[in-house]
UniProtKB/Swiss-Prot annotation:
This is UPF0297 protein LEUM_0557. It comes from Leuconostoc mesenteroides subsp. mesenteroides (strain ATCC 8293 / DSM 20343 / BCRC 11652 / CCM 1803 / JCM 6124 / NCDO 523 / NBRC 100496 / NCIMB 8023 / NCTC 12954 / NRRL B-1118 / 37Y). Pfam families: IreB. InterPro entries: IreB. Belongs to the UPF0297 family. It comes from the Bacteria.
Amino acid sequence: MTVGDETAIFDFGNQMPKDIHETLEIVYSSLEEKGYNPINQIVGYLMSGDPAYIPRLNDARNLIKRHERDEIIEELVHAYLKK
């Protein structure tokens, strides 16, 4: 085989994307820790898509950006309406 014919391997290690519920718990607690109103900040992010609403503390900003906003909203509506 010549150089360039080999398949490159990318390893995520142990950093698999967290599920939406776990991500929201981390984001919520990070916002509380920073002294912000978590609900207002999360709604601001979901409506605008601006990650500045979410702090970098505990990697919250990077975690929430791993999920599509519409998927987060879908999960929230599902959890709210679940009986």
